[in-house]
Regions:
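Short beta-strand/loop segment at the start of cytosolic alpha/beta domains
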Residues: 1-15, 129
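Intrinsically disordered or compositionally simple regulatory linkers and C-terminal tails
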Residues: 108-130
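Short, charged low-complexity linear motifs
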Residues: 15, 82-83, 124
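Residues at or immediately preceding the N-termini of alpha-helices
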Residues: 25, 103-104
């Protein structure tokens, strides 16, 4: 798996290419941890070039979502479609991960304010993994 990264201010757009599976989830986790090590905790995972995610890949996404939240950041998903959207729907994780159709919307979401001026949660179901 190849993972390109684009830095947009405080946000890193991660663009993996290939399947996120048992064989590749270690590479994904390593890339995320490397970003955490340099203080980058606001991540957008662009799934446009990820044709397939298995249970191990999904587990890695969940674990890194939790890790990002604990570090004061977040992991948001971009270009989720087909098999991956179905997988997230069946597992009810569409209520946990915020998903976006545009990079700009995903990036802006880290800075939007919710009711009472509080920063919006990284996900509608964010308390589940707090």
């Amino acid at each position: 798996m190849r993972i390109d990264e684009v830095v947009r201010g405080e946000i890193v757009i991660m663009r993996p290419k290939g399947r996120l599976t048992l064989e590749t989830e270690g590479e994904f986790r390593e890339a995320v941890r490397r970003l955490f090590d340099i203080g980058r905790t606001r991540l957008v995972l662009d799934l446009a070039n990820v044709p397939y995610v298995d249970s191990c890949g999904l587990g890695a996404m969940i674990q890194e979502f939790i890790s990002a939240r604990r570090r004061g950041g977040g992991l948001k998903l971009l270009n989720v479609c087909g098999h991956i959207r179905h997988l997230l729907a069946v597992t009810k994780l569409l209520t946990v991960f915020e998903t976006f159709e545009s990079e700009d919307a995903a990036a802006r979401s880290f800075f939007e304010r919710g009711p009472r001026g509080k920063a919006r949660s990284s996900s509608p179901g964010g308390a589940f993994f707090s």
